A protein has these predicted regions:
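Conserved beta-strand/short-helix segments
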Residues: 1-301
Length: 301
């Protein structure tokens, strides 16, 4: 913890050594905040049971002098045979309570303190102890289905704003799974945005309820069940029939929800392209068959 870094600051450092049969071998260092400051990173250290439920134990490191002696703790995930050097989470004292100081002077995490079958973390500070509750981790798979599968501008199937239009319904579904133990906190909120033709300046399609090409939505989901929502839109008259219309969904778990958190490896964007109907056969591949015939007519010959 007394290691001197840049500008002669007591930044601290944690070295990783691998235990062998005869000796210890160096296996790198743990990376903390790069800002030169008195930190005493490594003042406290705890090996904790698997916090992210990937099958490997993790490490928590305290840095009680960071942020002007307010303090912080770092969470590092374990991997096969080592510890990942880049921290996965930095928890600042200032984000918890304005009066905390020397947060991270001691750390411990071996027990479930709130009865949800997850190991929680206890962190010592000046005149205080803070319990950090673990949260479940969910993997969310988003999918898009579109009906009809292509846009036929010659078959306008619905009236919109006083004129016949081509209407399409995109249905987004979210399916959640979890590798965390126990059954609590299985319900959570999802906030998502849907964009039509997200890279184009002019709108070729808009949503029925807003007449805009971008909408913000939210829904409630639960582990083990699919949560779906229809998104009806219609196509505006356009001269660009070559490039397909894109539907892009970007989502995140609701920040205001105290339930589970999203697995950092989960993709948060799904995109689908809806082509225009070309009437080019079963393979939808149009092959041009243009023939040019020329004749010469010389006047006066």
């Amino acid at each position: 913890p007394m290691y001197l870094g840049g500008q002669s600051k007591e930044t601290g450092r944690v070295y990783i050594y691998k235990v062998g049969q005869l000796l210890l071998t160096s296996n790198g260092t743990l990376r903390a905040d790069k800002k030169p400051q008195d930190s005493r990173f490594g003042y406290s250290l705890a090996a904790v049971p698997d916090l992210n439920h990937d099958g490997f134990n993790d490490v928590v490191v305290g840095a009680p002098l960071e942020d002007g002696h307010r303090g912080a703790v770092y969470v590092y995930h374990g991997s096969r045979g080592t510890i990942l050097p880049q921290y996965q989470q930095r928890i600042e004292a200032s984000s918890l309570h304005p009066s905390l100081s020397y947060f991270g002077r001691s750390v411990d995490g071996q027990m479930d303190l709130d009865g949800d079958e997850l190991v929680d973390l206890a962190v010592g500070a000046q005149g205080a102890a803070v319990v950090l509750r673990s949260r479940r981790i969910v993997q969310v798979n988003a999918s898009l289905a579109v009906h009809p599968a292509s846009i036929n501008v010659l078959q306008k199937n619905c009236p919109r704003h006083g004129q016949d239009s081509v209407c399409v319904t995109a249905t987004v579904c979210f399916r959640a799974t979890s590798r965390s133990p126990g059954r609590g906190d299985r319900h959570f909120g999802i906030e998502y945005s849907v964009a039509l033709d997200d890279r184009k300046f002019g709108a070729r399609a808009v949503f029925d309820d807003t007449s805009q090409k971008l909408v913000q939505k939210r829904l409630r989901a639960s582990v083990g069940r699919a949560a779906c929502q229809p998104l009806p839109f219609h196509v505006i008259d356009t001269t660009d029939y070559l490039r397909p219309v894109s539907v892009t969904v970007t989502f995140a778990l609701s920040d205001s929800d105290p339930g589970p958190v999203l697995d950092e490896r989960s993709a948060t964007t799904v995109k689908k392209l809806i082509p225009f109907f070309k009437d080019c056969g079963e393979d939808n591949e149009c092959v041009t068959d243009l023939v040019l015939q020329a004749s010469m007519d010389l006047a006066g010959s």
